[in-house]
Amino acid sequence: MDRRTVLKSTHIQQKIAEKKAELENLNEIKKFTSILTNQLDELENKLDYMAEGTESVALVLSNWQNVVKSVSLASLGLLKYSEKDYETGAPLPECLVRIKLDKDDNVGEEIQEKEEMETDDYISDQQAEESENINEEEDRQEVQTSYTD
């Protein structure tokens, strides 16, 4: 009997040791699961932040095409100048018109009126210059026809 009791007690001690090892493994799994959960939460936050950033980049890129078109339109006016115009100085591209978006902004109205006046003056100067060029061309043609007569 003594031997049976010893066998039972060693068997019980062995099972207790196995259960302790299993408990340690489960505690370790729980610890690693907690760490993994924290890392996944951090990853989620970073992905949300990246998603917001990509939305901002997408907005900028969608507007970039409009910026390029505006610059292109402003530069088209440079094509009408001749080499003589470049001798006095490089001509500037066409002015871009600003459109007021806020109706309650009085300062914006003043700025817009000033810009419109400058644009009108610029257009008037351009038209006067063009009519002057046309008059000079007509005078040349008249002089040439008078020599041929």
From Swiss-Prot:
Annotated region (Disordered), positions in chain: 107-149
UniProt entry tagged with the keyword Ligase: no
Alphabetized UniProt keyword annotations: Cell cycle, Cell division, Centromere, Chromosome, Chromosome partition, Coiled coil, Cytoplasm, Cytoskeleton, Kinetochore, Microtubule, Mitosis, Nucleus
Chain coiled-coil ranges: 7-56
Gene Ontology annotations of biological process type: attachment of spindle microtubules to kinetochore; cell division; mitotic sister chromatid biorientation; protein transport along microtubule to mitotic spindle pole body
Subcellular location as annotated: Nucleus; Cytoplasm, Cytoskeleton, Spindle; Chromosome, Centromere, Kinetochore
GO annotation, cellular component aspect: cytoplasm; DASH complex; microtubule; mitotic spindle midzone; mitotic spindle pole body
Pfam families documented for this protein: DASH_Dad2
Compositionally biased region (Acidic residues): 107-140
Role noted for this protein: Component of the DASH complex that connects microtubules with kinetochores and couples microtubule depolymerisation to chromosome movement; it is involved in retrieving kinetochores to the spindle poles before their re-orientation on the spindle in early mitosis and allows microtubule depolymerization to pull chromosomes apart and resist detachment during anaphase.
UniProt record similarity statement: Belongs to the DASH complex DAD2 family.
Quaternary organization: Component of the DASH complex consisting of ASK1, DAD1, DAD2, DAD3, DAD4, DAM1, DUO1, HSK3, SPC19 and SPC34, with a stoichiometry of one copy of each subunit per complex. Multiple DASH complexes oligomerize to form a ring that encircles spindle microtubules and organizes the rod-like NDC80 complexes of the outer kinetochore. DASH complex oligomerization strengthens microtubule attachments. On cytoplasmic microtubules, DASH complexes appear to form patches instead of rings.
Full protein name: DASH complex subunit DAD2
Annotated gene: DAD2
